[in-house]
């Protein structure tokens, strides 16, 4: 972590990882326990921070119990940004996601869309359009933009990440226009020797 004094009116704490520069969020999470850092966790964090640097999300994918959601949540906790986990199902519709994204973009929070590939493919197509609108606003560096026909504010700290478990039945393939919005990271069963 660094204190950034160049080019800013108010001094901010900056987290730098490889080329990514993320701002400390000052969101108090309480005195909670932290995740054990393994090479797998480190790889996931580097992918997430690299994705955020280019205004994309991350896509940790792998079997159950590999730490996909927990790694995302713990990085958010480490840089003091609120991360809302949203458990996806085939009941999710595009209007739910529109409200979810609008609220998070205005607050500068992260979301982790857990089991994202459970959502119906028709809904995923609309979600891709929604996320492309948000990414375009982030790339332009604007403070306000029109999201699905409604003007909203946006904070640059916003991040949307998804987790997928490709092995389960009833999962859909992500459309191409959605896949390009997320950097993939393969998660596997961690070495229990490192954790113990």
Positions of the model-derived regions?
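Phosphate-binding P-loop
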Residues: 40-41, 49-55
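Conserved alpha-helical scaffold flanking the Walker A/P-loop in AAA+ ATPase domains
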Residues: 49, 92-115, 144-153
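Conserved catalytic/switch belt of AAA+ P-loop NTPases
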Residues: 101-102, 117-155, 159-168, 176, ...
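Conserved AAA+ ATPase core "coupling" helix
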Residues: 95-98, 171-196
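Loop/turn-to-beta-strand initiation segments
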Residues: 55-57, 82-84, 107-111, 122, ...
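Extended, charged/polar low-complexity intrinsically disordered regions
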Residues: 1-39, 43
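Walker A/P-loop
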Residues: 53-86, 100-103, 126-128, 133
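Conserved nucleotide-binding/hydrolysis micro-motifs of P-loop NTPases
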Residues: 66, 90-93, 117-120, 160, ...
């Amino acid at each position: 972590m660094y204190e950034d004094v160049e080019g800013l009116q108010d001094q901010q704490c900056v987290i730098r990882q490889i080329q990514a520069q993320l701002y400390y969020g000052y969101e108090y999470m309480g005195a909670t326990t932290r995740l054990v850092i393994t090479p797998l966790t480190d790889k996931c964090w580097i992918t997430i921070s690299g994705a955020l640097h280019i205004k994309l999300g991350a896509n940790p994918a792998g079997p159950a119990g590999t730490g996909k959601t927990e790694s995302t949540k713990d990085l958010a906790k480490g840089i003091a940004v609120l991360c809302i986990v949203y458990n996806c199902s085939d009941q999710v519709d595009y209007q739910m996601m529109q409200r979810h994204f609008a609220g998070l973009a205005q607050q500068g929070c992260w979301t982790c869309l857990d089991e994202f590939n459970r959502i119906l493919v028709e809904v995923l197509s609309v979600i891709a359009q929604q996320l492309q609108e948000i990414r375009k606003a982030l790339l332009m560096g604007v403070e306000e933009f029109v999201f699905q026909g409604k003007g909203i504010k946006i904070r640059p700290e916003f991040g949307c990440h998804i987790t997928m478990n490709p092995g389960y039945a009833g999962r859909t393939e992500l459309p191409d226009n959605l896949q390009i919005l997320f950097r993939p990271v393969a998660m596997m069963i961690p070495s229990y020797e490192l954790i113990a």
